[in-house]
Amino acid sequence: MLTIDEFHETVLSGHYASPADHLPARPLKKGFRAWWRFYASGLARVVAKGIRVVWKGNVTLKLFSELAYDMTRVVEVTGATVSFDGFDALRKLKGKPFVVVANHMSLIETMLLPAGVFAANDMTVVAKRSLTKYPGFGKILASCNPILLDRKNARKDLADTLEQGTALLKQGVSILLFPQGHRAEVFDPRKFNSLGAKLAARAGVPLVPVACKTDFARPGWPLKDFGPVDPSRPVRFACGQALDPTLPQRDLQKACIEHISARLTEWGMGVVKEQEENNVEGN
């Protein structure tokens, strides 16, 4: 099994695909056993590990990095393959701050994508404040110095993200955000706002788009965050080239949408076709 340092180095080489010794000899099929292994056995164990560290009061962003890699392993142990492609684009940014924007398909990218980003630099996330109220997970999230939004006042959320995000970026911490706001299996560019482009331009740091295919886990009912898992569905992340923050904001937004749309289409996922040119401007 790869150590976390070996994993990071492989990710920055440009291609990581789950090694054979990371996967079970007999992958589980979609059903209760896969659900149990992922949530009750895997996720619960990782959350418990994080809580123990938080209780001891010795929390650093390294914990966030370790837990993200642990969750990558949980997905693999359940039987799904995980791949990170194109992250060699981050090698030249290693140790430097940048902004990452990604589509929001499921809970999985919030847990696994940081594993790839941490390969290049420390990072934190923009998240809903309500997530900090989740048992266990909320305490871990709150300890990682996230930018928390109430999602009640769009103007205030924008101001908070730009102010707090710029301060963190100046401290050398990268920022990951999901401009869609809500999870959606079908990518609609009109709902992918330009907050990431605004933040990168304000702070003068590169903007990096990442496409995520994470339909391995789908929303459930009555508990949205504990839906069915299907190990036959690979988890994929594809990083685009770092974008110059001095480019016009419209061009930054367009480049991000084009990268994400192209990769999702390549993977057979749904993408809403833009009907009007101004759709790429975001909200």
Question: Which residues does each predicted region cover?
Answer:
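Short glycine-rich anion-binding loops that position phosphate/pyrophosphate groups of nucleotides
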Residues: 104-106, 154, 180-183, 213
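Short, glycine/acidic-rich beta->alpha junctions
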Residues: 105, 109, 157, 188-192
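Catalytic core of membrane glycerolipid acyltransferases/transacylases, capturing the structured
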Residues: 37-55, 94, 98-153
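Membrane-interfacial amphipathic helices and adjacent loop/beta segments
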Residues: 56-88, 120-163
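Hydrophobic/aromatic ligand-binding patch that stacks against planar heteroaromatic rings
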Residues: 116, 140, 167, 198-199
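Residue-level preference for the first positions of well-ordered beta-strands
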Residues: 97-99, 172-178
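A cross-family acyltransferase "interaction/gating" segment
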Residues: 137-138, 174, 185-251
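Membrane-anchoring hydrophobic helices of lipid-metabolizing enzymes
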Residues: 1-97, 111-112
